[in-house]
Regions:
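Papain-like cysteine protease catalytic cores
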Residues: 2-99
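Deubiquitinase catalytic domains
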Residues: 60-157
Length: 157
C-alpha cells in the first residue's frame, strides 16, 4: 500500500476495507482471541459475536459491514497504522493524557491525531494553519505543545 498523504481522502468504508485486508493468518488468532476475551468480560462494543468467528474471512466480513456493527478500536487503528504507514497519536479525555498504544515509537513521516472521548469514541483532530484544517501532520513538525505532552506522558519524542 502506498504511503498516505494530506491529499488522500478515505471514507469510513475504505478505511474498514483497508483494515480488514491487514488481517492475516499470523495476526488473526491474537485479534479474535482479544475480541472473545472482551466479550467474555462484557467489555465488547460490537453487534456481532466473536465466538462465532471461525476464519479470517468471517472477521473481515464483520469489519467491513457499515454502521455500528463493528466499532473502531485500538486493534483496527494498529491495522490501519501498519497499512497506511502513519502514526496515530491518541489523546484521552481522562488521565494519562495519551492513550497507551505502544506505537508512539513508530518512525512514520506522518501522524494523525485522535481524541478518545469517554473511553468509547474516537474523534479526528485537526490543526488550523492559514485558515485550513489539516488532519494529517508531519510527525517531525507537530506543534511543540503536542511534543511536550508526548514527552511528558511517554518519556519519548
Amino acid at each position: 500500500m502506498k504511503k498516505m498523504t494530506n491529499d488522500d481522502v478515505y471514507t469510513a468504508d475504505s478505511l474498514r476495507e483497508i483494515a480488514a485486508n491487514q488481517i492475516t493468518e499470523d495476526n488473526f488468532p491474537l485479534i479474535i482471541e482479544s475480541y472473545r476475551l472482551e466479550a467474555d468480560s462484557f467489555d465488547f462494543n460490537g453487534n456481532w459475536e466473536p465466538s462465532e468467528i471461525t476464519s479470517i474471512e468471517d472477521l473481515r466480513t464483520e469489519l467491513i459491514i457499515p454502521g455500528n456493527n463493528f466499532w473502531g478500536d485500538i486493534i483496527v487503528l494498529q491495522l490501519l497504522q501498519q497499512a497506511l504507514k502513519i502514526n496515530f497519536i491518541i489523546f484521552r479525555s481522562d488521565s494519562p493524557k495519551l492513550y497507551p498504544t505502544a506505537t508512539e515509537n513508530e518512525d512514520y513521516e506522518l501522524s494523525i491525531i485522535l481524541y478518545y472521548e469517554n473511553n468509547i469514541h474516537f474523534k479526528l483532530v485537526g490543526i488550523f494553519q492559514s485558515n485550513n484544517l489539516y488532519t494529517v501532520q508531519k510527525t517531525k513538525k507537530l506543534p511543540k505543545f503536542i511534543g511536550d505532552i508526548i514527552k511528558e506522558d511517554t518519556n519519548n519524542y
